[in-house]
Amino acid sequence: MAARTSQRALARVASGCHPKSTTVTEATARGSARDVRHLAACGVLINRTLPPCAAVLPKEICARTFFRISAPLVNKRKEYSERRILGYSMQEMYDVVSGMEDYQHFVPWCKKSDIISRRSGYCKTRLEVGFPPVLERYTSIVTLVKPHLVKASCTDGKLFNHLETIWRFSPGLPGYPRTCTLDFSISFEFRSLLHSQLATLFFDEVVKQMVAAFERRACKLYGPETNIPRELMLHEIHHT
């Protein structure tokens, strides 16, 4: 009797040391299938490897370019022009624009401005622009027709493929002698793709600030502008 009891005890111990063969019931199978489907939906099946980054990220994120600009990184010439009535005389505005040695004192982002040479109707200038420690220099030939025209064209080709700035002054409103009509235009194309993309982002704002800076300079030198009736004001802007 004791021997049979010992044999049954040993059999129970042995059966606990070996895996049992179990029959999977239909309910168990359904539960397992649900678990597998749930895991698959969550994308966390253990035996799956993570997909590469490009497959995980949305296409619109992967397609973004530098500064999130959707256009391709290609140089494009930018052009801007405007016509407006100013409350200063032709001579006053001509003197402000042609005084390039003073640009460093009032033109936004102009850190240094020098007249390299000068002769009748022309001068050669060198400007340093930018934000320290990133500064760029370029040289321009300036055509001067007093008091009608100041035209600056970049000549060194290191920073720009093309740069031309034109200020034209003509008589203003009849009956308002201290006014003039300004026709301003600028066109440029950077050599650097980075500069070109920055220009695309900030071009309009930079140009507006630049024109406003010349008006403030005229106000500082010659006092408040002539008061022009609102119905006679003219301001047209074109840019590409």
From Swiss-Prot:
Q: Which PANTHER family match?
A: COENZYME Q-BINDING PROTEIN COQ10 HOMOLOG B, MITOCHONDRIAL, SPERM PROTEIN HOMOLOG
Q: Which GO terms describe its cellular component?
A: mitochondrial inner membrane; mitochondrion
Q: Name one GO biological process term.
A: cellular respiration
Which InterPro entries does the annotation name? COQ10-like, COQ10_START, START-like_dom_sf
Its organism's taxonomic lineage begins at: Eukaryota, Metazoa, Chordata, Craniata, Vertebrata
User: What family is it from?
Assistant: Belongs to the COQ10 family.
Organism of provenance = Mus musculus
Residue range of the transit peptide in the UniProt record, numbered on this chain: 1-39
The UniProt gene name for this protein comes to Coq10b
Question: How does this protein assemble?
Answer: Interacts with coenzyme Q.
Family annotation (Gene3D superfamilies): 3.30.530.20
Its subcellular locations are: Mitochondrion inner membrane
- Provide the membrane topology annotation: Peripheral membrane protein
Recorded protein name is Coenzyme Q-binding protein COQ10 homolog B, mitochondrial
Q: Which GO terms describe its molecular function?
A: ubiquinone binding
Principal place where this protein is found?
mitochondrion
Q: Which UniProt keywords apply?
A: Membrane, Mitochondrion, Mitochondrion inner membrane, Transit peptide
Q: Which SUPFAM superfamilies match?
A: Bet v1-like (SSF55961)
The UniProt function text for this chain reads: Required for the function of coenzyme Q in the respiratory chain. May serve as a chaperone or may be involved in the transport of Q6 from its site of synthesis to the catalytic sites of the respiratory complexes.
